[in-house]
């Protein structure tokens, strides 16, 4: 990627490419953080019974599985939505069925 | 690296806007926001785990899952009820809960990171 060429930020005028890169990196980092917050909250409900003096191995395994299954679920939903959108678009005029 | 930035970044009026400074400030704000988010969710979860029926003070609040315990007036009596995982005072429960929540958060963060790296490797 040629960062010394004219700015790739279409319509934004002369945006500093260094700042642009910074924004992209930080945005991605934030996306990660947000998902960690969300998954921790969800998995806490599933994996934590009574908080003890330390996180026992069963609870820890549960958290790991929970993360994996959450990502699986998310991917499944995206894939299936993509498929059903091809055959029968959801977000279109013909919503009534 | 030629570029258009420099002293003309925002030069009208007093002071120039230093992109480096802006980036540092943004990083700090992001970190603060994340800490607040963590605190908010942790407080929610630990309140649910440790405070059942709220009493007149933190000491006098029941922990959930102990029906008929009533308002805790005598901590000693509660101990003799031999519940190995329920600490005598909500504060101890909350403290443990906080530590466990941090453990959970770190575990989730690691697991998610591993999964992302695995996905990238498979592309």
UniProtKB/Swiss-Prot annotation, chain A:
What does the record say about tissue specificity? Answer: Highly expressed in fetal and adult brain, followed by fetal lung, liver and kidney. Also expressed in heart, placenta, lung, liver, kidney, pancreas, skeletal muscle and heart.
| Positions where Phosphoserine occurs in the chain | 57, 87, 94, 96
| Purpose | Mitochondrial intermembrane chaperone that participates in the import and insertion of some multi-pass transmembrane proteins into the mitochondrial inner membrane. Also required for the transfer of beta-barrel precursors from the TOM complex to the sorting and assembly machinery (SAM complex) of the outer membrane. Acts as a chaperone-like protein that protects the hydrophobic precursors from aggregation and guide them through the mitochondrial intermembrane space.
Q: What is known of its domains?
A: The twin CX3C motif contains 4 conserved Cys residues that form 2 disulfide bonds in the mitochondrial intermembrane space. However, during the transit of TIMM8A from cytoplasm into mitochondrion, the Cys residues probably coordinate zinc, thereby preventing folding and allowing its transfer across mitochondrial outer membrane.
Lineage of the native species? Eukaryota, Metazoa, Chordata, Craniata, Vertebrata
Instruction: State the species of origin.
Output: Homo sapiens (Human)
Partners and quaternary state? Heterohexamer; composed of 3 copies of TIMM8A and 3 copies of TIMM13, named soluble 70 kDa complex. Associates with the TIM22 complex, whose core is composed of TIMM22.
Alphabetically, the GO molecular function entries are: identical protein binding; metal ion binding
Q: How does it sit in the membrane?
A: Peripheral membrane protein
User: Which family is this sequence assigned to?
Assistant: Belongs to the small Tim family.
Would the keyword Nucleotide-binding turn up in this protein's UniProt record? no
Motif Twin CX3C motif per UniProt: ranges:
43-66
Report the superkingdom from the record: Eukaryota
Tell me the compartments it is located in: Mitochondrion inner membrane
The identity of this protein, by name, is Mitochondrial import inner membrane translocase subunit Tim8 A
Gene that produces this protein: TIMM8A
**Pathological condition linked to this protein in its record:** Mohr-Tranebjaerg syndrome: An X-linked recessive disorder characterized by postlingual sensorineural deafness with onset in early childhood, dystonia, spasticity, dysphagia, mental deterioration, paranoia and cortical blindness.
Q: List the disulfide bonds.
A: 43-66, 47-62
